[in-house]
Amino acid sequence: MTSRDSASSEITPAVLLRAYACGIFPMAESADDPTLFWVEPELRGVIPLGGFRVASRLARTVRSDGFRVTVNTAFKATIAGCAAPQAGREDTWINKRIRDLYSGLFELGHCHSVEAWQGDDLVGGLYGVSLGRAFFGESMFHTARDASKVALVHLVARLIHGGFELLDTQYVTEHLKNFGAVEIPRRRYTALLDKALAGEPGDFLKLSPGEAIPGARALEIIASRQ
């Protein structure tokens, strides 16, 4: 289900948080389209944290620590990377309005990024929204092989360690299926979301602020949930 906002409506970071609490999120038709529309899928993509899968080759890459992984150190560069065209993804739904709104959520502590570096070059990463014990993954990018996958592994370890219960991917792609993503009906999703929003919120920075932990430790945390 989609619903377009009027040109005069004002979507603020506070409005955005209320929308996420209701299971709704905004998108744009393209990076050049200034308008947004609200989305509430009939089938929602989630990755069960206890069922997150890491292929053997990727696990070796994670353990090698070939990428320097950081958290919340290059948010604007990460969202810009997600908005940039890539092979197989010539256009994106991330327009300037989206970038500004989520930068506002970042300033409020409700949006986070995980970045993967080679030297001084940002070569991959992801960002998403944290609310209660739910994390809503928004987008990821990479310019080096496996960079965004390594960032995702570190994200999941952080969510598990921080007491999160729900990793919402919004939709399921063939790529995300490799990590255990599944589609669930809206009613089931709403029940999971309500549970994740009740009680004490998750602590995204409990694992470590700034620099991420070694890859081997991230894999240990993930294995402890399975």
From Swiss-Prot:
EC class: transferase
Catalytic reaction annotation: N-terminal L-lysyl-[protein] + L-leucyl-tRNA(Leu) = N-terminal L-leucyl-L-lysyl-[protein] + tRNA(Leu) + H(+); N-terminal L-arginyl-[protein] + L-leucyl-tRNA(Leu) = N-terminal L-leucyl-L-arginyl-[protein] + tRNA(Leu) + H(+); L-phenylalanyl-tRNA(Phe) + an N-terminal L-alpha-aminoacyl-[protein] = an N-terminal L-phenylalanyl-L-alpha-aminoacyl-[protein] + tRNA(Phe)
Enzyme Commission number(s) of this protein: 2.3.2.6
UniProt signal peptide: none
GO BP terms: protein catabolic process
GO MF terms held by the record: leucyl-tRNA--protein transferase activity
Family to which this protein belongs: Belongs to the L/F-transferase family.
Name the record gives this protein: Leucyl/phenylalanyl-tRNA--protein transferase
